[in-house]
Amino acid sequence: MSNSDRSATGFSYNTRLNILHGPLETIDVAGLVEACTDRWYNQTLCKVDESVVRLGVVHGEYHWHKHDNEDEFFYVVSGQLLIDLEGRTIDLTPGKAIVVPKGVRHRPRAPERTVVLMVERAGIVPTGT
C-alpha cells in the first residue's frame, strides 16, 4: 500500500506501508537510500513484535501532526532532521535520536537530504492527525 500526499511546499510524500522484509532477511538499507529519488520517502522495512522499523529519506518539511495513541522514535543516520514542537525545535544530527511522545504536535523537516530510521507501533498512521 502506498500513500502519496502533498507537502505544504508542493512535493509529494511517498509513504509505503508494505513490509519489505521478514525475519532473518538481510535489509540493504544503503541500497534503498541510493535508489531513492523522492524528496520525502517513508518505507516500512520490517516488523519487530508489535512495532515496525521505517526508513525515511527526506528533504524538505512535513506537515504539523500528532499521533494520539503512539510514540514515535527517530534516529538520524545522515544529514540533519529538525523536529519542530510547539515552542521549540530539536536539532538531530547523525547518531542522535529522540522519542516524540503520543499526543505531541510536531513537524519534522530536513534542510538537506537526510536518512532517518523510525520505530513506531505497527498500526500507526504515519501522516498523523
Residue ranges and their predicted role:
Residues 57-59, 67-84, 119:
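Short, conserved beta-strand element in jelly-roll/cupin
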Residues 85-86, 94, 110, 128:
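Short glycine-/acidic-enriched loop or helix-start segments at secondary-structure transitions
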Residues 102-129:
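Ligand-binding loop in jelly-roll beta-barrel domains
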Residues 49, 77-78, 93-94, 112:
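A cytosolic small-molecule/anion-sensing beta-strand core signal
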Residues 38-39, 52-68:
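Conserved short histidine dyad/triad with adjacent acidic residue
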Residues 50-52, 59-61, 80-82, 89, ...:
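Short, charged/polar surface micro-motifs in flexible loops or helix N-caps
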Residues 86-102:
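Short acidic-glycine-tyrosine-enriched beta hairpin
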